[in-house]
């Protein structure tokens, strides 16, 4: 059973086996506490978040930088969401609204564009050892930020990465500009460093609480025991606890799935095997 929660109480609902945090915005300490303590109890957490907020409208798309509030907590565990977007020559297609000059008039139309922000992941880009992608040999990721991991205390598995011909965009120019780049509408990445970027990772091991040794200064106690005394903060998780991070949240949005299905046909995976 799937249950939605905003974690505003500072706790994850009882009997939760897997906590998925999708496209978080301006997380408060109580919400971070709920995520943190669920992980410390040995629960599996999946974070799907980017450094960019992508807006879709009927006639344009845009992206602006954002801070979701999850960044300090992830950084505590040695995981950073890069403040860029990954572009790749191994790409998918997107029915995108564009404007075309027709004589003295401007015409709005929709084109099926080769879209470098939709990264077409093939079997060689997907982890085939953990069992998470069992039976999956292709996946498209949308508007994804790269991940940087630096925590030798954890066992880190790359779930999927971009191709060796990918590069990073620091500007967020996700709307095509055919005046500037007539051939494709986008910067080709010429002169940029080309390399594979981590797009999703799975970290496992013992995690230390972000709240360890810190006062819990929000307006409710972390929890109350049967004798009425506050429950202590759990400061370390059991061994083998798992945290997965995906550098995009919008790829799960209904509007994006509908648009991409329209462009590429139904090519969406069933649930991942976490």
Spell out what each predicted region is:
Residues 1-274:
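Acidic, S/T/G-rich, low-cysteine, solvent-exposed domains in lumenal/extracellular/periplasmic regions
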């Amino acid at each position: 059973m799937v249950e939605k929660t905003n974690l505003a109480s500072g706790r994850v609902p009882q009997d939760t086996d897997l906590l998925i945090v999708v496209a978080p915005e301006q997380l408060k300490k109580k919400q971070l506490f709920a995520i943190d303590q669920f992980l410390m109890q040995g629960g599996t957490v999946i974070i799907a978040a980017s450094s960019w907020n992508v807006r879709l409208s009927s006639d344009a798309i845009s992206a602006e930088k954002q801070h979701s509030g999850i960044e300090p907590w992830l950084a505590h565990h040695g995981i950073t969401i890069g403040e860029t977007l990954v572009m790749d020559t191994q790409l998918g297609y997107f029915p995108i609204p564009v404007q075309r000059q027709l004589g003295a008039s401007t015409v709005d139309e929709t084109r099926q564009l080769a879209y470098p922000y939709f990264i077409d992941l093939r079997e060689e880009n997907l982890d085939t050892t953990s069992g998470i992608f069992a039976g999956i040999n292709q996946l498209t990721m949308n508007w994804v930020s790269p991940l940087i991991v630096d925590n030798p205390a954890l066992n880190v598995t790359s779930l999927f990465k971009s191709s060796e011909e990918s590069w990073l965009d620091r500007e967020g120019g996700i709307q095509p500009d055919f005046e500037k780049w007539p051939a494709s509408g986008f910067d080709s990445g010429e002169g940029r460093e080309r390399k594979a970027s981590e797009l999703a990772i799975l970290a496992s091991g013992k995690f230390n609480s972000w709240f360890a040794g810190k006062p819990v200064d929000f307006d409710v106690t972390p929890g109350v025991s049967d004798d009425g005394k506050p429950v202590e903060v759990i400061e370390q998780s059991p061994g083998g606890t798992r945290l997965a991070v995906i550098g995009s949240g919008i790829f799960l949005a209904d509007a994006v799935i509908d648009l991409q299905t329209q462009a590429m046909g139904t090519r969406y995976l069933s649930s991942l095997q976490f």
